[in-house]
Amino acid sequence: MSGDDLDERIETYYVRVRGVVQGVGFRHATVREAHALKLRGWVANLDDGSVEAMLQGPAPQIDRMLAWLRHGPSTAHVTEVTFEERPTDKRFERFQQH
């Protein structure tokens, strides 16, 4: 068995966060939180002022990240978080900011 053991149930979720989430360090804080939870994927700004992310990892860590995204860093004001599971065979290598 590998030390990585990514064969446990890995889930992938697409997330959209709306509110005051650009220009406040939201993506940087999201990367830090994702690294702390050992999640993989990415986070990016969208032209409409929202932030999108792809989260990949075990369900308990995904749930913790979704809970964190509902408020984000203290500099942000989150008004809405939507998410949906996106089953995929693709495995991200790390979590990064786009």
UniProtKB/Swiss-Prot annotation:
Coiled coil: none annotated. GO terms for molecular function: acylphosphatase activity. Residues 12-98 form the Acylphosphatase-like domain. It comes from the Bacteria. PROSITE patterns: ACYLPHOSPHATASE_1, ACYLPHOSPHATASE_2, ACYLPHOSPHATASE_3. Its EC number is 3.6.1.7. It catalyses: an acyl phosphate + H2O = a carboxylate + phosphate + H(+). Transmembrane segments: none annotated. Keywords: Hydrolase. The active site is at R27, N45. Gene3D superfamilies: 3.30.70.100. Belongs to the acylphosphatase family. NCBIfam families: PRK14424.1. This is Acylphosphatase. It comes from Burkholderia thailandensis (strain ATCC 700388 / DSM 13276 / CCUG 48851 / CIP 106301 / E264).
